[in-house]
Amino acid sequence: MPLHLRMLFPAFTLATGFALGFIQPTGLLLGSAFAALLLVCDRYLPNWLWLMLTLLGGIALAAHLLPGFNPWQLWKPRRLSVDAAPYALRLSWDKLLLGTTLLAWWLAQAPRPAISHRRAGLTCVVTLLSVPLMAIALGLVAWQPKWPEGLLLWLAVNLGVAVMAEELLFRGVLQPALIKRLGVWPGVLLTASLFGAAHLPFSALFALLATVAGLGYGLVFLYSGRLSLAIALHAAVNLLHVLLLSYPLRLT
């Protein structure tokens, strides 16, 4: 896909957020600079510098550290599980921008060969079983089956914003770079560890769980060569969480 068409992804996100009043001029400027860095400067900057700036900018957007972005509250806080705190669904425009910009970059990357579809399938099954069971064993959640009102909206936001941005950043950008420098297993393991560390604000145990989940997502991408499968697996784990377990986390 030509660059001018791929640029429409972040441009539409910024224009929509600005028109609706959720992105301020400062956010518009910073978001445009990030999109230009990611999509244009990769051919002019040394690879290490582009990678470092992309990761720093990506983390800043994902962690809501840049000014000029206000979330869109789609649900008022409500209790989805009797043992969990009230949950409010929000659309984070900075994280959405990260995902759409990384998607525009990813569409220009060469396809990756598959190593083993059988291993990829087995990893999906193991991840879908082990992550929820580990979450229960660690006391992070309990068995709380439910069908929340507004589930489809939750799924659209979770998949289209959180999951897509996280997988494109960690598995799409970071994991291949680390594998190239460190080798396959060190690269996959370090990426999973950094993915887990990004969840430390929730708790150390949740970060450990995220590391295990991240290992599954990374191996699925490695074995299948398809980032879309890692995104689908990540979304499936999150869907099992909201449908079957305490959400977001069990109160202690």
For the regions a protein language model found, what residue spans apply to each?
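Functionally important transmembrane alpha-helices
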Residues: 164, 185-192, 196-198, 204-252
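Juxtamembrane helix-loop-helix connectors linking adjacent transmembrane helices
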Residues: 71-162, 251
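Hydrophobic core segments of transmembrane alpha-helices in multi-pass, intramembrane catalytic enzymes
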Residues: 28-35, 95-99, 153-157, 209-217
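Cytoplasmic-side transmembrane-helix entry/capping segments in multi-pass membrane proteins
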Residues: 47-58, 117-126, 177, 182, ...
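N-terminal, membrane-interfacial amphipathic/helix-forming hydrophobic leader that caps
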Residues: 1-110, 242, 246-252
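Alpha-helical transmembrane segments and their cytosolic membrane-interface
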Residues: 1-15, 154-157, 163, 177-179
